[in-house]
């Protein structure tokens, strides 16, 4: 569907500027994810509140912009990333900050909270921290021509020190 079709399917939210915003149902939310997947819309933003999620969308054929919002009374919403992978990190962020769960997401690992926070969902229901946080499985870079380069500890000036691992493909760095 075009962005105008999604806007017409929703309930207009008054006093939202400069772009129109509507509250939609789960079916319309899923239709927007499908339009992202087929390239007719572009994702400008995906963010949450304690009980709802929002998507800012660009219609690629008209350059119109609009925002759709979905209430999450059961703290769940249909995953956008299941159809459009660039939505994956914002979905994981929404879960970490607000405790809202994207159903059928392809990756449910935490994005911000790796088990070190004193609580879960600090901007949502503020639940106690998990007693035994699960280990965070970082995804490895794998392949015959890949080389891992460890750098650090380093200090980059205005940011804190860190230890980084870069992956190079196809050539040896000496």
Language model segments and positions:
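Terminal low-complexity/charged segments
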Residues: 1-173
């Amino acid at each position: 569907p075009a962005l105008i079709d999604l806007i017409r399917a929703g309930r207009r939210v008054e006093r939202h500027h400069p772009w129109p915003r509507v509250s939609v149902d789960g079916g319309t939310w899923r239709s927007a994810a499908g339009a992202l997947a087929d390239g007719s819309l572009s994702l400008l933003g995906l963010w949450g509140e304690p009980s709802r999620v929002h998507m800012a969308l660009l219609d690629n054929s008209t350059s119109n912009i609009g925002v759709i919002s979905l209430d999450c009374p059961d703290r769940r919403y249909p995953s956008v990333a299941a159809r459009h992978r660039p939505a994956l990190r914002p979905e994981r962020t929404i879960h970490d900050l607000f405790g809202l769960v994207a159903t059928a997401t392809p990756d449910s690992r935490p994005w911000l909270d790796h088990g070190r926070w004193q609580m879960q969902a600090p901007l949502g229901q503020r639940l106690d921290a998990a007693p035994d946080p699960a280990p965070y499985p970082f995804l490895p870079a794998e392949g015959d021509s890949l080389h891992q380069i460890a750098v650090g500890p380093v200090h980059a000036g205005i940011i804190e020190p860190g230890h980084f691992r870069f992956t190079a493909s196809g050539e040896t760095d000496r």
